[in-house]
Amino acid sequence: MTHKSVRDYIRTIVDFPHEGILFRDVTTLFADPRGFRIAIDQLLAPYAGMRFDKVAGLEARGFILGGAVAHQLSTGFVPIRKKGKLPGRTISVSYQLEYGEAVVEVHDDAIQAGEKVLLVDDLLATGGTAEAGIKLIEQLGGQVVGCAFVVDLPDLGGRKRLEAMGMEVHALCAFEGL
């Protein structure tokens, strides 16, 4: 029997959402029970023996992964959402997009000072959203002790951006090219 790698479960869609883009679709990974289990196990592998107080996931596919990772670790899950999607009191950080600006938010009581947090998302591109998530966690007094992604797009420089912030970055696979 041939064993598939996580990368083998990810479908590439040409010209989505715009012409010239190769969209790395992880929903095919999520839909396969074996692939999804492999991904969760591999996301956690570098952190064996470490203790986390919370797992934070970036909207939207980071919620799927982060929830599964938090369950596996028996810890809480913190959603980092687009502006205006969380009820109650929040804090926010804005960050630059290719054409404009975006804002992400987290509940102001989601993370306590000193808590160790693992940040999880499906894909690392430029690192802008992840950097904003890290800043939110740090504003609340949390410590990001790892950043775990299924896919890294190294040509877009996200890993270097996060590593320049002192972050440990773990990705299950990389896709070169845009």
From Swiss-Prot:
The keyword ATP-binding does not apply. Its main location: cytoplasm. Homodimer. This is Adenine phosphoribosyltransferase. The keyword Cytoplasm applies. GO terms for molecular function: adenine binding; adenine phosphoribosyltransferase activity; AMP binding. It is an enzyme of class 2 (transferase). Pathway: Purine metabolism; AMP biosynthesis via salvage pathway; AMP from adenine: step 1/1. Catalyzes a salvage reaction resulting in the formation of AMP, that is energically less costly than de novo synthesis. Its EC number is 2.4.2.7. It is found in: Cytoplasm. The gene is apt. GO terms for biological process: adenine salvage; AMP salvage; purine ribonucleoside salvage. It holds the Pfam family Pribosyltran. Keywords: Cytoplasm, Glycosyltransferase, Purine salvage, Transferase. GO terms for cellular component: cytoplasm. InterPro entries: Ade_phspho_trans, PRibTrfase_dom, PRTase-like, UPRTase/APRTase. It catalyses: AMP + diphosphate = 5-phospho-alpha-D-ribose 1-diphosphate + adenine. Belongs to the purine/pyrimidine phosphoribosyltransferase family.
